């Protein structure tokens, strides 16, 4: 009964441009618990575009993409979560793992947007590598 009501509550969650962070994250958790991912990835993507330092939103997006079988995107979102937490070495590790997956052509990786994902991941890998190098020269 509880799962039915949580499923009904998740089904009634709607996101708009006026959705607050709290509504997005709480509604997103309800949708994840109910296994209803429709629209959640889009809402989270829209959110992180305007709030790139929101580690929790990136982490939820990573979980959504993982459940949707979007392994590379999931790893990239996890990396962005680490960047938001200023853990650049961990972010770089995840980005390199995503690059390896793309190069290896592992199952669940290739898709119609694989070249776009690869370009974003390559760019972010260079940016994070530069941040790490800059930090090393300061110390």
Segments (PLM) and residue ranges:
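Alpha-helical junction/boundary sensor with strong preference for TPR arrays
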Residues: 16-17, 51, 85-86, 102-105
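Alpha-helical linker/edge segments of TPR/alpha-solenoid repeat scaffolds
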Residues: 33-38, 67-77, 107-108, 112, ...
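Short coil/turn linkers that connect adjacent helices within long alpha-helical scaffolds
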Residues: 14, 47-48, 105-107, 111-112
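Alpha-helical adaptor scaffolds
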Residues: 1-2, 9-68, 72
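Extended alpha-helical scaffolding segments
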Residues: 72, 88-89, 97-108
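Alpha-helical solenoid repeat scaffolds, predominantly canonical TPR units
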Residues: 8-12, 43, 74-78, 82, ...
């Amino acid at each position: 009964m509880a799962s039915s009501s949580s499923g009904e509550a998740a089904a009634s969650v709607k996101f708009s441009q006026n959705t607050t962070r709290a509504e997005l994250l709480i509604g997103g958790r309800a949708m994840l618990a109910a296994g209803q991912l429709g629209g959640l990835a889009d809402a989270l993507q829209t959110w992180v575009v305007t709030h790139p330092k929101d580690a929790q939103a990136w982490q939820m997006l990573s979980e959504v993409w993982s459940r949707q079988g979007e392994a590379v995107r999931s790893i990239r979102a996890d990396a962005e979560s680490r960047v938001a937490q200023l853990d650049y070495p961990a972010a770089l590790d995840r980005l390199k793992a995503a690059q390896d997956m793309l190069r290896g052509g592992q199952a669940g990786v290739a898709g119609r947007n694989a070249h776009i994902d690869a370009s974003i991941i390559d760019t972010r890998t260079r940016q994070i590598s530069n941040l790490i190098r800059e930090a090393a020269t300061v110390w």
